[in-house]
């Protein structure tokens, strides 16, 4: 009798392990939740429809819950199709028995989607004219990433949502002729990010002839404004036309210069608040870095030339460290390096307000 019970429990144990293994790694195909999932999704927004071929139920032994995996999921937003690579719904174990659709969280992933899919999503809440402009900004590139969306017991979306993803090999056509090329950026959003905001870290990309790798942009979205903190790493060649375009954004004047060109490696902090109607306020900036070679050709002052015949309107710098920052209404510049005097370079140090 003892051997019989031992064999019985061994068989039950092996059977239980086999079922757990099957449900964890292979899954059980079912249509138990199909209609309910579609109706719940379509109730969320009148212009959003969820479509999928079938569902598979998996056991999640780590959290002791069920995972409903939708097969070949896609979202239709105002008849615009967005293909998803994954849409997993996490439910309590009792949901399979009671048919109560008590959603705990959802994981939504997409892989190698066209960057223009962004404007399909933003079209739900942005005015049509603004969304058209946004669609023009995103010229080309791919998207990949994953949303994790928690749900409260009453079915509402929880606060601890998050997103992690990438923009890959994109071209971003910004206003005033600013074209960012070959942009690859990591994007993270959620409670684990500083102040619960969004952080974009540029891994590669270029603006004009400047490389932007290792630049970081932090956004904190509030009710009526967006707080933007950025650290822009620019490395490469610069020209006078580029200087004028960038200076216009910072409110700097270039009237006294005839030409500027050089090669730099700079880190620039730019912080500001973007208010209603995209109005910029509380702008502050600071720059540090190294200048390998820099030529500044200023407008020649005849009065100075008259009394200082050796005066040269062209300034040539090399191997120079620069620090520039604004303090209230003052702009402070510090330079320390080599400056060309006649046919040779001399060391110099300047601090100017």
Walk through the language-model features, giving the residues of each.
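Hydrophobic residues on conserved beta-strands that form the core of alpha/beta folds
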Residues: 50-54, 68-70, 84, 103, ...
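N-terminal Sec-pathway targeting helices
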Residues: 1-16
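Short, cysteine-centered beta-strand-loop-beta hairpins and adjacent loop/turn segments enriched
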Residues: 73-81, 174-177, 296, 344
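Extended amphipathic, helix-rich lipid-handling scaffolds
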Residues: 41, 87, 106-172, 192, ...
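Solvent-exposed loop/turn segments connecting transmembrane beta-strands
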Residues: 30, 61-63, 79, 174-180, ...
């Amino acid at each position: 009798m003892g051997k019989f019970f031992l064999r019985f429990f061994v068989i039950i144990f092996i059977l239980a392990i086999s079922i757990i293994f099957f449900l964890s790694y292979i899954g059980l195909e079912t249509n138990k939740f199909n209609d309910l999932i579609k109706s719940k999704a379509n109730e969320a927004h009148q212009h959003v429809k969820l479509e999928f071929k079938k569902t598979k139920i998996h056991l999640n032994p780590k959290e002791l819950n069920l995972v409903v995996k939708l097969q070949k999921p896609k979202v239709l937003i105002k008849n615009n199709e967005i293909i998803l690579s994954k849409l997993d719904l996490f439910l309590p174990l009792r949901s399979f028995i009671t048919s109560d659709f008590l959603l705990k969280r959802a994981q939504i992933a997409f892989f190698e989607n066209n960057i223009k899919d962004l404007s399909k999503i933003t079209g739900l809440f942005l005015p049509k004219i603004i969304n058209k402009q946004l669609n023009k900004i995103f010229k080309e590139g791919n998207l990949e990433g994953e949303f994790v969306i928690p749900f409260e017991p009453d079915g509402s979306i929880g606060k601890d949502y998050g997103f992690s993803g990438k923009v890959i090999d994109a071209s971003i056509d910004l206003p005033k002729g600013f074209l960012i090329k070959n942009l690859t950026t990591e994007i993270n959003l959620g409670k684990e990010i500083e102040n619960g905001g969004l952080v974009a870290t540029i891994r590669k990309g270029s603006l004009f002839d400047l490389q932007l790798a290792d630049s970081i942009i932090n956004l904190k979205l509030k009710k009526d404004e967006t707080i933007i903190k950025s650290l822009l790493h620019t490395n490469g060649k610069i020209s006078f036309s580029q200087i004028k375009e960038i200076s216009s954004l910072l409110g700097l004047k270039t009237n006294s210069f005839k030409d500027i060109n050089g090669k730099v490696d700079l880190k620039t902090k730019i912080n500001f608040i973007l208010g209603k109607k995209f109005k910029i306020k509380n702008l502050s900036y600071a720059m540090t870095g190294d200048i390998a070679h820099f030529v500044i050709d200023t407008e020649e002052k005849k009065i100075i030339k008259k009394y200082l015949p050796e005066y040269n309107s062209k300034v040539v710098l090399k191997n120079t460290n620069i620090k520039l920052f604004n303090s209230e209404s003052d702009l402070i510049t510090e330079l320390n390096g080599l400056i060309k005097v006649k046919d040779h370079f001399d060391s110099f140090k300047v601090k100017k307000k």
